Amino acid sequence: MQFEVKDLINKIKKDGLEEAERASNDIILKAKREAEEIVARAEEAARVLKAKSEKEANDYKCHALEASRQAIRDLIIGVEKNLKSLFENALKDNVTEVLSDNNFLAELIIKITDSWAKGEKLVIQLNESDFSSLEQILRLKLGNKLKEGMELRPFRGISKGFKIQKKNIGLHYDFSAETIADILFDYLNPRFKEVIKVV
């Protein structure tokens, strides 16, 4: 009986140990599965996060490149406008300087009025500051034309240059520094654009 009890105790121990080992193996197996699931979920989350980060980085790069391109375009347009403005101002200054020479201006007026039909009534409008000196030169050079209906008048709206008006029609021909410079600039502008074209 003593052996039976001992065998029974050993059997209970053995069964308990086997059950404990089986339970322990089940727990370990379950823990491994859970760990594998956690790792798989973590890897999936990391993959999704990496893909999202790469997309955001790529989007940021694309936006940054587009912003850079726009900034470069704006800079080029700004430089072109500034160069165009400098060119236009230099052109106006040069035309004004040329038209400041009263002898040249008088010759120009004479050549232009010579091409008009005889007997046409013309009014030559000169800027006020140059009127007296130009009037003397023109009276000497035009002589009889002034008696035949050509008239010289001071005009406030002209800085340099002159305007010619046909009396009967009311038509004006503008030879002021501003108008000549504008016409030259419009003529030269396409060529100027080709010279400064960067892109």
Swiss-Prot record:
Domain of life from the UniProt record: Bacteria
Sorted UniProt keywords: ATP synthesis, Hydrogen ion transport, Ion transport, Transport
NCBIfam families from the UniProt entry: PRK01558.1 (NF002424)
Function: Produces ATP from ADP in the presence of a proton gradient across the membrane.
Protein name: V-type ATP synthase subunit E
One cellular-component annotation, GO: proton-transporting two-sector ATPase complex, catalytic domain
The organism of origin for this protein: Borreliella burgdorferi (strain ATCC 35210 / DSM 4680 / CIP 102532 / B31)
GO molecular function, one term: proton-transporting ATP synthase activity, rotational mechanism
Record-stated family: Belongs to the V-ATPase E subunit family.
InterPro entries in UniProt: ATPase_V1_Esu
